[in-house]
């Protein structure tokens, strides 16, 4: 009924915002790792 529709919408929104946050976290980790690798390559410390 109406309740399950609302609950479904809320869950979907939570899931989407959760995935966005996870994506941001993962993205930041990838960026940081990339910067670390680039930095050690420039210094020749890899």
Swiss-Prot record:
Domain of life, per lineage: Eukaryota
Cystine bridges: 40-46
One BP annotation, GO: killing of cells of another organism
InterPro entries reported in the protein's UniProt record: Antimicrobial_frog_2
Primary site of residence: secreted
Keyword Disulfide bond: yes
Keyword Disulfide bond: yes
Localization (cell): Secreted
Keywords attached to this entry: Amphibian defense peptide, Antibiotic, Antimicrobial, Cytolysis, Disulfide bond, Hemolysis, Secreted
GO cellular component: extracellular region
Similarity comment: family membership: Belongs to the frog skin active peptide (FSAP) family. Esculentin subfamily.
Function: Antimicrobial peptide. Stimulates insulin secretion by BRIN-BD11 cells in vitro. Shows hemolytic activity.
Protein known as: Esculentin-1a/b
Naturally occurring in which organism (per UniProt): Pelophylax ridibundus (Marsh frog)
């Amino acid at each position: 009924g109406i309740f399950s529709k609302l609950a479904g919408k809320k869950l979907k929104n939570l899931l989407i915002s959760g995935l966005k946050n996870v994506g941001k976290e993962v993205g930041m980790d990838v960026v940081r790792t990339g910067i670390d690798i680039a930095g050690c390559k420039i210094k020749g410390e890899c």
